Amino acid sequence: MALSMHTNYASLVTQNTLNSTSGLLNTAMERLSTGFRVNSASDDAAGLQIANRLEAQTRGMSVAMRNAQDGISMMQTAEGAMEEMTNITYRMNDLATQSLNGSNSDKDRAAMDAEFKQLSAELNNIMGNTSFGGQKLLAAGGGFEAGAVTFQIGASSAETLDVDASASIKKVAATLADAAITDGIGDATKAKAALDKISDAGGLIEDIGATRAQFGANINRLEHTMTNLGNMVENTSAAKGRIMDADFAVESSNMTKNQMLMQAGTTVLSKTNQLPSMAMSLLR
């Protein structure tokens, strides 16, 4: 290597190496301080684009999980109301059956009739006032009575679940409004008509049971949907993490290595900067 006063090649090489090492040290320290391997598009342009797409998918699926849970809660509210209606209907069936027994006096039948009518009124009360989040569910024009309720259960617009229990709910409401129910069980004729309307095929007990079965089937489906969404969120998040997250073991090693190289480079630079003075010594 020539000994020159004007160009200190060794110093230039050392400076360039120091600049490169400084950049690597800064990158390692930035990754350690933020916890991310990719802090700007320049770190990994393709990786950042993929990670952004995975993040959007993950967020969409997380919202879909909440939607599914809300759907389950909404249907559980309606099904719970129907469960109580079933219990009430069983009691009404018992009263109608008991009223037909010849051992009852007129006062006995009147007492049974009064209870029967109160229970019938409570059935209508449940139908009219069961609500979720301020929305009536079983009343005329209510959520499930009006038609299909659509739940968004995926990250794309095509991933939906339509729950349509309107026909069976309307049938229950029509049965409750039937004279066989509203007239009570004050005499044997009325009691027989009520008993038939409650317990026969296509009667109130069967209609309520069919409605509950619809809700139950869709609740079970949504629970499986949530499990699958949770699995997808877990794996999509892991994939995004492999792209975006810093490996602390690797970055700590890089930081230590580059700190040592910076120290060594600084020492070497001070030595190379002394080379031009060596040329002056030749003139003494």
Swiss-Prot record:
**What else does UniProt say about it?**
V.parahaemolyticus possesses two flagellar systems: a single polar flagellum propels the bacterium in liquid (swimming), while multiple lateral (peritrichous) flagella move the bacterium over surfaces (swarming). The polar flagellum is synthesized constitutively but lateral flagella are produced only under conditions in which the polar flagellum is not functional. The peritrichous flagella are unsheathed and powered by the proton motive force.
List localization entries. Secreted; Bacterial flagellum
Q: SUPFAM superfamilies, from UniProt?
A: Phase 1 flagellin
Taxonomic lineage: Bacteria, Pseudomonadati, Pseudomonadota, Gammaproteobacteria, Vibrionales
According to the UniProt entry, its GO molecular function terms are:
structural molecule activity
InterPro entries assigned to the protein according to its UniProt record, in alphabetical order = Flagellin, Flagellin_C, Flagellin_C_sub2, Flagellin_N, lat_flg_LafA
GO cellular component term of the entry, any: bacterial-type flagellum
Q: What biological function has been recorded for the protein in this entry?
A: Flagellin is the subunit protein which polymerizes to form the filaments of bacterial flagella. Essential for lateral flagellar synthesis and swarming motility.
Q: What protein name does the entry list?
A: Lateral flagellin
Q: How does it assemble?
A: Homomer.
Q: Which Gene3D superfamilies match?
A: 3.30.70.2120, f41 fragment of flagellin, N-terminal domain, Flagellar export chaperone, C-terminal domain
- The signal peptide annotation in the UniProt record is none
| UniProt record similarity statement | Belongs to the bacterial flagellin family.
| The entry's keywords | Bacterial flagellum, Secreted
